[in-house]
């Protein structure tokens, strides 16, 4: 089992919580043709993740939480609960109002989502250095003995 990240003590003290993320395009033409609502698309994705990971998480005596969000930024209820928990803990730690910290957490999530979607659609910002041969013909000479 390979999840995206593990955090200890999110829901219960000294108990790991396994998180797996998914960004879906709920407004895709395929879903629109089938008249699938955003909430149904989010719930279906969450059920798929739970079905895949829950047994393995329980075997490790951990909890599992799917973090599902659409490309438009609509979050599944499990992600909303996780963000509320993070905001509450940070609010207590930083001695700031909960509303201020909640807005900060949401903005950070939105920027992370924009970055993830942008990298997914456009690719990496790093330029790939080619071998210097425009047509690729010289690459064969590099690998000859």
Show the residue positions of the predicted features.
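Non-catalytic C-terminal interaction segments of nucleic acid-processing enzymes
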Residues: 1-3, 9-17, 23-145
């Amino acid at each position: 089992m390979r999840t995206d990240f593990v955090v200890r003590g999110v829901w219960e003290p000294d108990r790991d919580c396994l998180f797996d993320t998914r960004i879906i395009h709920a407004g895709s033409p395929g879903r629109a043709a089938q008249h699938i609502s955003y909430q149904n698309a989010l719930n279906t994705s969450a059920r798929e993740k739970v079905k895949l990971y829950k047994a393995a998480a329980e075997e490790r005596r951990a909890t599992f939480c799917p973090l599902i969000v659409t490309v438009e930024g609509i979050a599944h209820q499990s992600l909303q609960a996780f963000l509320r928990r993070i905001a509450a803990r940070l609010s207590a730690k930083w001695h700031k109002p909960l509303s201020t910290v909640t807005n900060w957490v949401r903005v950070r999530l939105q920027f992370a989502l924009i970055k993830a979607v942008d990298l997914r659609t456009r690719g990496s910002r790093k330029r790939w250095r080619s071998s210097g041969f425009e047509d690729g013909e010289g690459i064969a000479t590099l690998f000859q003995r």
